A protein has these predicted regions:
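N-terminal auxiliary segments of SAM/dcSAM-dependent transferases
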Residues: 1-74
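Short helix-to-loop capping/linker segments positioned immediately adjacent to catalytic or ligand/cofactor-binding
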Residues: 15-19, 112, 163
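SAM-dependent Rossmann-like transferase core, predominantly class I methyltransferases
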Residues: 45, 55-133, 138-153
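S-adenosyl-L-methionine
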Residues: 152-163
């Protein structure tokens, strides 16, 4: 089965399941399974997909068809230029939250301020502020131990120092 065939199969299945972003989701899942950038799928659409990868791709597509969020399947979210690990223990960062970060970064700028991110979850807000406002001292807290571990991992992943 080629990359093109895999994508068409998953797109049809996801579309029939009511997934509005069926094309994007199919591409994300296949690039995740193949461990290649999404753009490479389009460039290499006639490349054969090995049987193990195909089986995994079908499993993940079926999971997505049941409305499991894409970010929970791939454990990944892009947020404000950051690479974040995401799982069921934290909320998926939303575009509206990027707007909040943009405004906070604009206000903080290069000032030496203390910033507290309550209920940090994945740490996306704290990490974005720490990344773009190096003079700020950022602290992130959450009641969930699992969320704190994810936020710590995301801070390391994005090379920022957060307390």
């Amino acid at each position: 089965m080629t990359i093109h065939d895999c994508l068409k199969f998953a797109e049809k299945s996801l579309r029939e399941s009511g997934i509005e972003s069926f094309e994007y989701d199919a591409q994300e899942l296949l690039s995740y399974c193949l461990n290649i950038p999404r753009l490479n799928l389009l460039i290499n659409k006639n490349l054969e997909v090995n049987q193990d990868c195909y089986k995994r791709f079908i499993q993940l597509s079926e999971l997505r068809a049941t409305r499991v969020p894409l970010q929970h399947i791939t454990n990944h979210s892009d947020f404000y230029g950051l690479d974040l690990y995401i799982d069921k223990n934290v909320l998926i960062p939303r575009f509206e939250t990027e707007l909040l970060c943009e405004k906070a970064i604009e206000i903080i700028n290069n000032k030496e301020l203390f910033v507290l991110d309550l209920c940090t979850g994945s740490g996306c807000i704290a990490i974005a502020i720490a990344k773009h406002c190096p003079n700020a001292k950022v602290t992130a807290i959450d009641i969930s131990y699992d969320a704190i571990k994810i936020a710590e991992e995301n801070a390391k992943r994005n090379s920022v120092n957060i307390k």
